[in-house]
UniProtKB/Swiss-Prot annotation:
InterPro entries: Exonuclease_RNaseT/DNA_pol3, Oligoribonuclease, RNaseH-like_sf, RNaseH_sf. CDD domains: Orn. One of its GO terms (biological process) is DNA metabolic process. SUPFAM superfamilies: Ribonuclease H-like. 3'-to-5' exoribonuclease specific for small oligoribonucleotides. This is Oligoribonuclease. Residues 20-183 form the Exonuclease domain. It comes from Burkholderia cenocepacia (strain HI2424). GO terms for cellular component: cytoplasm.
Length: 206
């Protein structure tokens, strides 16, 4: 799939060091030493999540032998979504996908500036460090993990936690947009707004 530009109804995203890079992968399993990446997508937003630009979405070719090692859940989920067929038909390698994604992201944010953003993103980062190490170094060492807020909300405000229902599409681009929507939900319903600064006062140093 090719990259999708920002919609005509919203302003174009301007290159800025505060922009956020959202990422999601689908893998054949959970172990980066034995499993492989089969799909990857990115979305860039501004810092307030108001503007979003979709990057390329790649199904990564893997051998039939690799696909055969998937457990029943992965075979069922990725078969139902059509991803397994896309992986078999793809000619894109992990290295080729990483290079194109990095070139796309460089239009919107400098290397080393954006945390890696998503849900349970450290798992994606483990696979990236194993199979796309140069691309992994494009990101800041910090992560912006929506699942942190999810776990806190589940314990501290269970009623609010239950208010966001995930669709569980298990396709990379759909999962990214769901993560962004989930963070917006927690910002509105769970996070405490910053106190307004009175006229003439300065905000405290970070």
């Amino acid at each position: 799939m090719t990259d999708t530009a920002a919609s005509a109804s919203q302003p174009a995203l301007v290159r800025n060091e505060l922009n956020l890079v959202w990422l999601d992968m689908e893998m054949t399993g959970l172990d980066p030493d034995n499993d492989r990446i089969i799909e990857i997508a990115v979305v860039v937003t501004n810092s307030t999540l108001d503007i979003a630009v979709e990057g390329p979405v790649f199904a990564i070719h893997q051998s039939d032998e690799t696909l055969a090692k998937m457990d029943d859940w992965n075979k069922s989920t990725h078969g139902r979504s059509g991803l397994i067929d896309r992986v078999r038909a793809s000619t894109v390698t992990e290295a080729e996908a990483a290079a194109q994604l990095q070139a796309f992201l460089a239009q919107y944010v400098s290397p080393g500036k954006s945390p890696m953003c998503g849900n349970s993103i450290c798992q994606d980062r483990r696979f990236m460090a194993r199979w796309m190490p140069e691309f992994e170094r494009f990101f800041h060492y910090r992560n912006l993990d929506v699942s942190t807020l999810k776990e806190l909300c589940r314990r501290w405000q269970p009623a609010i936690y239950k208010g966001f229902q995930k669709r569980a599409m298990h396709t990379a681009l759909a999962d990214i947009h769901e993560s962004i929507d989930e963070l917006k939900y927690y910002r509105e319903h769970f996070l405490i707004p910053a106190a307004s600064v009175s006229a003439g006062e300065s905000a405290p140093a970070a």
